[in-house]
Design a protein with these regions (language model features):
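DNA major-groove recognition helix of helix-turn-helix/homeodomain DNA-binding modules
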Residues: 50-68, 176-193
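Key DNA-contacting residues within the recognition helix of helix-turn-helix
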Residues: 11, 40, 68, 166-167, ...
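Short, charged recognition helix plus adjacent turn
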Residues: 69-110, 192-239
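Short alpha-helical DNA-recognition segment
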Residues: 22-41, 147-167
Length: 239
């Protein structure tokens, strides 16, 4: 295993998180579904923390982005994702997510110069996700946004084999902690986006919406309400 200062810092934060919870290693191991030796080896950096391990940490209440790359959660009101959730059946929510995404992208692209670099980054990623028919591979979209056509280029950048990279890109394997740290350093998207912890498209819509002007936000909200004009927000929840 290649040890870097960034990975060592992650292991240290893992230890701090455990101690803040007032857990010894045995109790923490139980909380994240490991044996005590398995947990001890991961915290000490003797074994790589896998993507599955990180999902267990997330399920236990850990802030994965803070733990991995020392980044606080981006302030967000989650307006769009909350509205989408009121549409009931998953097929309907996916339809709403798609048309709202198209509408927001259309509005943003006309005013792209008004947004911060971070918001532009989210807009470009959302546009790429919308182009991807499966809408479930962050790494495909990362390659698209950065104009990388050859998997070998990004696998070399990450220091992993093309075979391993291909498995991760095609959702046959979750990226481990070291890969996630490198992805963040290279492209700036937080690790949790690669671990299927939430719907990335909905999260991007929330971030972008918060950056829009109040007038444009009102236009978006009116658009959403007109998608089901016969029902109020509260009534949609009950359907």
């Amino acid at each position: 295993m290649e040890y870097t200062d960034r990975y060592k810092a992650f292991c240290k934060r893992m230890s701090i998180y455990r101690k803040l919870m007032d857990y010894d290693q045995a109790k923490m191991a139980v909380r994240v579904g490991m044996t005590t030796p398995e947990y001890s080896n991961r915290e000490a950096g003797r074994s790589m923390v896998s993507g599955i391990d990180l999902r267990k940490f997330s399920d236990s209440g850990a802030d994965i982005d803070k733990m991995l790359v020392d980044v606080d959660e981006k302030p967000c009101r989650y307006v769009i994702s909350s509205e989408i959730e009121t549409f009931g059946e998953e097929s309907k929510k996916e339809y709403v997510r798609g048309v709202v995404s198209e509408h927001i992208l259309y509005m943003c692209e006309k005013k792209i110069a008004d947004f911060s670099d971070d918001t532009v980054k989210y807009i470009r990623l959302l546009k790429s996700i919308d182009k991807d028919s499966t809408k479930d591979s962050m790494l495909k979209c990362i390659r698209d946004v950065n104009g990388i056509t050859d998997q070998q280029v990004i696998s070399d950048n990450l220091g992993i084999s093309r075979f391993k990279y291909s498995k991760i890109e095609n959702n046959k394997e979750l990226p481990d902690a070291m890969v996630l740290i490198r992805l963040y350093d290279l492209y700036g998207y937080v690790p949790s986006m690669y671990l299927n912890l939430y719907d990335v498209r909905s999260r991007l819509l929330d971030y972008i919406f918060d950056s829009m002007s109040q007038k444009d936000q009102e236009i978006i909200m009116n658009f959403i309400n007109k998608l089901d004009p016969g029902l109020s927000r509260e009534e949609r929840k009950c359907v």
